[in-house]
Amino acid sequence: MKLQTLLSRLPGFWVHRGGNPDIVALEMDSRHVTPGSLFFCVKGFTVDGHDFAEQAVERGAVAIVAERPLSVNVPVVVVPDSRRAMAILADAFYGQPTHRLHLIGVTGTNGKTTTTHIIEQVARKAGKKIGLIGTVGTKIGDRSYPAVNTTPESLVLQRTFKQMVDEGVEFVTMEVSSHALHQGRVHGCDYDVAVFTNLTQDHLDYHGTMEEYRNAKGLLFAQLGNRYDERRPKFAVLNHDDPVSQYYKHMTAAPIITYGIKEKSDVMAEQIEMTPGGMAFQLCTPHGTMAIETKLVGLFNVYNLLAATAACLASGFSLATIAEALANVSPVPGRFETVDEGQNFTVIVDYAHTPDSVENALKTVRQFAKRNVYVVIGCGGDRDRTKRPLMAQAAVRYADVAVFTSDNPRSEDPRQILRDMEAGVSAGDGTYVTIPDREEAIRYAIGQAQEGDVVLIAGKGHETYQIIGDDVIDFDDRAVARAAVKERR
C-alpha cells in the first residue's frame, strides 16, 4: 500500500521530507523492522520510540510516524499522538477487519475475563467460529496463544483481527482495558456490543483519580454507535446495580440493555441459591424466563452470567441456546479454580487483585466454608499503592487468617509493599502473618488447614510467572498449592 493512500485515513498530520513509498509492514519495535516497514515512534513508560528512529531506518523502514520532525532520510509523518495514529493506520492497513466481524467489547474493573469466556462458550454452542482476546490469552477457533496485555497494542490487535477474518472467524469477544482505551489502542475497532461489568478501585497509579479511571472506561461507550449501519445495530450492556452505569448511559448513542440483581433491569437473576455443585437461579429476560443451574459459584459470577446473557441476546442468540450454554460453562483458568488432590479441605486459586474482588471472593468462600478461612494475598509492585491497605483490610476482615506475601514485586522492595499493606490493618481488625516468599506463604497456609477449612490463594490466578526485579521466574500458584497438598499426605 502506498504511504499517501494509507495516510488518507489519518486526520491532522503533516509530512516532513516528502515521498510516497510502498508500505509492506507496520512496526513499533525497531528490532522487528524489515525493509518496507512504516515505523511508529511511540513513547513508553521507560523508552521513547523516537530514540530508535535511525535504527529503524537502518533496518529498512521507508517512512516514520513521529510526534516531531526527525533527522532521517525518509518521510516523517508528524502527528499529535503516535499511538493513536498507529491504531487508525493499522485498521486501514489491515483492511478494517472488524467491519467483517461481530465484535463484543467488555470493560470494567472485575469480571471481564469470565464474562468474555462465557460469551465465547455461548457462541460456540450456537455453532459460531469464535475469536477471543483477553488476559488469559488469544483464541482463534480452537488455537490458543499467550497474552502480553489484557488488550494488545493496536498493531497486534488489528493483525489478529485480520488473521481471524482470513480464517473464517465471524464472532469475537474481547476484554477492553482502561489503559487501552485511554491510549487509543482500540481506535478503529467497530464494536457491535459494549459491556460494562463494574467499577471499583484499581489502576490509580496510571489514571490518578477514580473520575479519570471512570472516564477512560467510558470511552468504549462514547465511540459505540457513531458509525450507523442499519444491518448491524449497536448495543450498550450496562450493570444497572452499579451507579456508574448512569454516567455511561449518557455517553453512548447506542440503545441500552441493562442487567442486575437489585435494580429492575432488562436481564435479571431471581431466587438465587447455592447448590452443592454451584448455583441455581431464575433468569428473567424480555424473551422469557428460564431456570439456570451452573457450576460457577459466587454472586459476582451471577453478574458475569447476566452480563454475558445480555450481550448474547443483543447479538441475536436465542434464550434457549444461552441457557443451555450457561448450564455447561467451564470455569476460567485461575478464576476461583479449585486444587483438588483428595484432601479434606478446600484450596482455591483466584485472580482477585482489587479490594472489591478480594472481598467478593472471601464472601463467597464464607458461604461454603465449614471452619476457618485462610487467604494468601500480596500486591503488585509498580502499581496502584493506594489499594494495598484496602486489600489488606478486606483480607483480615473476611478471613480468619490472612497471610501477606509477595505478588509480582517488580522493581519495588517486597518488604515495602508488605509495609504498605500492614498500614491498613489496625489492632483488633483480624489475624495476619507476613511471609515475603510467596511459595513459603502458600505452603504455610496449606500446612495450617484442617478438615473443612478453605485456603484462598489470591492475586495471580492463571499466571505462570513471578516478576522480581528484572527477572521473570516460573511460578504457578496452582502448581505450588498442588505440591504442598501432596506433601501433607
Swiss-Prot record:
GO terms for cellular component: cytoplasm. Pathway: Cell wall biogenesis; peptidoglycan biosynthesis. UDP-N-acetyl-alpha-D-muramoyl-L-alanyl-D-glutamate binds at residues 30, 149-151, 177, 183, 185. Keywords: ATP-binding, Cell cycle, Cell division, Cell shape, Cell wall biogenesis/degradation, Cytoplasm, Ligase, Magnesium, Nucleotide-binding, Peptidoglycan synthesis. Carboxylation is probably crucial for Mg(2+) binding and, consequently, for the gamma-phosphate positioning of ATP. ATP binds at residues 108-114. Belongs to the MurCDEF family. MurE subfamily. HAMAP family: MurE. This is UDP-N-acetylmuramoyl-L-alanyl-D-glutamate--2,6-diaminopimelate ligase.
